[in-house]
């Protein structure tokens, strides 16, 4: 009996030693070094049939066939043939979320981009400051303000390209960061913060008087997002004016609601620089649409019209008609009497949820509008719309694949669009087109899963009004 016992002891010792060796190996295991995927070659499979969320549009006034599109989570795109083709020009940079794009009025090849979407939704990505291109978007350089996370807009002095103003919204989920209004007098090499309220308040918009570049108007917004709630306003929100190019500021809230304010959208009428419009979010539902006829010295309420500072609250004054102003919201609206009354512009056969607008300065019936469904163009003030079907910037929440043969299919749910599916490859030389993609359910879509044994069975998760 001694021999079997000895064998058993040896076996136990071997097992224990093996176990110890395995534990030691696990303990000595070092995390893998950073893996680069630069060697992988990516190809676009689309889709563009629903496009995606636009944050800004900048048109070259010297060549209206050329314009730039800032995408909430899809970089910057450029067209040189009025939308027949779009080219991604920001894919190699460190941020994919864009808040604004600005063309230098003195040099159309000098482009400024503010990263980090300029809205306050839960799904809003952050950026890493401002970028500058001196060759029409072929190459870029990060010019700083990396801790801003969200940029509202950028203005370049109309006679001096070295002078730039940046409205830094600041981090959405925390205090501090690069927050406030910044100015550079050396082309972005250095920045001075010329307007600052507090660590919770950023500047969401900066506007320059069209006749006097020393006169500036700034809107500040106190906001903070938490996992459990969103704080959309506070004592830091308000309007400010400078008459000395930002050296000094005064608050211009006279006539605005005497309560805590939220997000304020501004625009100066190109027809008369004495007239400024403001759409104001305020506590106790006291917000509304305001008008100043004395360059912001006082404000008069025109109506109760306001939108959501969480997602909209931007306005655009008509370049020809003094009394016409457009409001970006779920259904885009317009006033023709200076803000007293509003009506929807008409969006039949157009995606809603609007964020950006360009109005032709010589033909105010010709617009470009950016929404959650891409770029739309109208030549007759919204009676008819042309959808740009070649901008593949759809925001997918999640994607899944099936086991179909010969090529697997891709499924996913999208932000403010449908749940959709499409092929990974096709049997023709033209490649995948919008016609190859198909809608599986309404939106917002979120998650899709496909039966691994039967690719015809697809499970979908949707939110909001997808079943209506």
What name fits each language-model region?
Residues 1-25:
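Bacterial Sec-dependent N-terminal signal peptides
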Residues 464-468:
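A short, hydrophobic C-terminal helix/tail in secreted or cell-surface proteins
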Residues 22-463:
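Beta-propeller blade termini and top-face loops
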């Amino acid at each position: 009996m001694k021999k079997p016992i000895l064998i058993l002891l040896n076996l136990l010792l071997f097992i224990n030693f093996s176990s110890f060796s395995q534990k030691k190996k696990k303990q000595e295991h070092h995390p893998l070094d950073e893996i680069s995927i630069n060697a992988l070659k990516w190809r676009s499979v689309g889709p563009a049939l629903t496009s995606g969320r636009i944050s800004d549009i900048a048109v070259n006034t010297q060549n209206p066939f050329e314009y730039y599109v800032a995408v909430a989570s899809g970089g910057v795109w450029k067209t040189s043939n009025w939308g027949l083709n779009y080219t991604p020009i920001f894919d190699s940079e460190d941020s994919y979320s864009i808040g604004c794009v600005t063309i230098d009025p003195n040099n159309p090849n000098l482009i400024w981009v503010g990263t980090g979407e300029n809205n306050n939704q839960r799904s809003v990505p952050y950026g890493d400051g401002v970028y500058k291109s001196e060759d029409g978007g072929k190459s870029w350089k990060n010019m700083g303000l990396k801790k801003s996370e969200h940029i509202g807009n950028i203005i370049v002095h109309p006679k001096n390209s070295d002078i730039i103003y940046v409205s830094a919204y600041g981090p959405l989920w925390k205090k501090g960061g690069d927050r406030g209004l910044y100015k550079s007098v050396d082309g972005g090499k250095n920045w001075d913060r010329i307007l600052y309220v507090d660590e919770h308040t950023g500047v969401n918009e900066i506007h320059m008087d069209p006749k006097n570049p020393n006169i500036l108007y700034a809107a500040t917004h106190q906001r903070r997002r938490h996992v459990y709630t969103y704080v959309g306003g506070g004592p830091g929100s308000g309007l400010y004016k400078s008459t000395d190019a930002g050296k000094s500021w005064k608050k211009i809230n006279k006539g605005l609601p005497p309560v805590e304010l939220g997000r304020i959208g501004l625009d100066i009428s190109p027809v008369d620089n004495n007239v400024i419009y403001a759409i104001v979010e305020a506590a106790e539902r006291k917000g509304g649409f305001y008008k100043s006829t004395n360059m912001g010295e006082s404000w008069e309420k025109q109506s109760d019209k306001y939108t959501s500072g969480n997602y909209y609250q931007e306005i655009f004054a008509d370049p020809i008609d003094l009394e016409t102003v457009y409001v970006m919201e779920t259904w885009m609206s317009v006033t023709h009497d200076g803000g007293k009354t509003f009506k929807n512009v008409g969006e039949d056969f157009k995606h809603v949820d609007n964020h950006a607008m360009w109005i032709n300065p010589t033909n105010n019936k010709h617009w470009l509008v950016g929404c959650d469904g891409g770029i739309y163009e109208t030549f007759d003030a919204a009676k008819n719309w042309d959808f740009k079907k070649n901008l593949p910037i759809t925001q997918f929440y999640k994607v899944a694949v099936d086991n179909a043969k010969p090529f697997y299919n891709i499924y996913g749910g999208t932000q403010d669009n449908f749940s959709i599916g499409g092929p990974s490859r096709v049997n023709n030389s033209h490649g995948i087109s919008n016609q190859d993609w198909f809608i599986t359910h309404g939106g917002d879509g979120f998650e899709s899963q496909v039966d691994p044994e039967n690719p015809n069975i697809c499970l979908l998760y949707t939110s909001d009004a997808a079943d209506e």
